Amino acid sequence: MQRLGSASPTSVGVWEPRLSFPIWPRGRGVAHVMCPEVPPARCDWLRRRMAEPGPQRGWFVFGFRGFAEPRGGGARRVEPEPGGIRLVRPAWSYTGLVTGRGRLALRGWLAGALPGHCQDLLPSESHVLLLRGAALEAWARGTGLCGGPAWRRRLHPGEAAGPLPLAPGGYVTPRPPFLCPLPPALQARKLVLGHEHAALLGPAGTVYTWGCGRHGQLGHGGLEPVSEPRLVEALHGVPMADVAAGGWHSVSVSEGGDLYVWGWNESGQLALPSKALAEKRPPAAASVAQPEEPGCGAGKAELKLVSHEAALGAEAVDFISIQAFPALLDLPQGSEVSKVSCGSRHTAAVTRKYGQLGHNEPASSDQPRQVGYFPANGLTVEDVVCGPWNTYVCAVEK
């Protein structure tokens, strides 16, 4: 796995490795399981889980985790939940976890008990939108998640919602007006939301985008806003398997594993040359090529967007701040991508061979780099979910 982009929203980046829940190889027994900072009841449950046969699976988080979270440690294991963690949905100051038993747990600045039987959620700093039973509900964050929902839409028989933000007849957002319509003829496999734009993956692998386009995040070649879903013509004819939206950038993965990026590259989140990052590097570092890490393409890739203005005095380097149409990204060793996710100003991708993530430094980067944390700990990455300023990774022992 590799990551690119902005390392932290401010100076708040926590990068020193800290593993609270070690994953032990199969056959080591419960005596070797340590559970620091965990209540005894949950620690006992963890010991029982770790004693079960078969490879163990867990979620890890890198980067900013909310003001209520302890600082220190670049890699932190997310505390396991009974029934396992089925979904991870990060917001800026907190994260929502949906367990295999339909329970919703909130971690970070916002914590509280919400109704059970949750299938999915969309968090934001103003509301938490839930798919619960046969209804869509929006709960106001400012009320401390008490009382009833601020908005509710019951699903009629035969209607199905999800994966969120998809909903019957359109899509939902975790802020008013909550429900937005889509053209009836437009079918969707997946829909993702950026700060000011949306991207939709159709059944045939086509990609549609709409919303604000001032940073090139729509991929139509211009910077004008688009009010209705429009086909990204540059990708037409190449079936896509996945799509992701960052704050002001977009990424898609073809069925063959190729990675396409477009939009804002100020922090190198597109893995294209960034003038802003080049100016921050020491002169020697800017002129000397970085040595390639062994097996760099074998895992999760963190992507960063770079500035598009030409740099005065730069030698043979074209900097990119805005990429207004999809660009095919060459990953090291020709790696094929299986999954991709975007944060506010960073991108992470899991390759089909292995998966790694989590650079042990707070500096931004506009180069795809393998994350050595997971192979060093005998783990293979299965999934990745980016929050605005962090990255959650699901990994299993090899």
PLM region spans:
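Conserved strand-to-loop turn within each blade of WD40 beta-propeller repeats
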Residues: H195, P203-A204, C212-R214, G247-W248, ...
